[in-house]
């Protein structure tokens, strides 16, 4: 699998699937979630509402992943996953790893060859970017997936540098 890094807007990526750092409600939130819903259009929200009614009445559990249309985005699908909130008092890194692992499993079910990930949980959920990069890269590399390209799309320079430094250190 090829792993690449881009500093930019995940909603601009022409890949098979874009991963959304969603909240439990699946009904749109802030950050990446808001941008994906805004650019993708009402089709994404309509499918999320249907998923809430039919499969996830209590919301999507942390670490799980589910796909919808990508609406007007350049991608074919959006894979929604709910990252954990960072807490120094409790190790939630297995849940963060689950976000990447389960998103890749959904991508495999869809037949996606290319997937773009944001830095899940590093915004309002306050996960330290260097640790998030390590978990993301370790998990993606260890995943048994048919996905040919994983692209990490980092919104700012700090995120981009954290991910590329982790990659070049060989620790991730």
Language model regions located:
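Glycine-/small-residue-enriched capping loops at alpha/beta junctions
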Residues: 1-110
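Phosphate/ribose-phosphate-bearing ligand recognition and processing surfaces
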Residues: 85-172
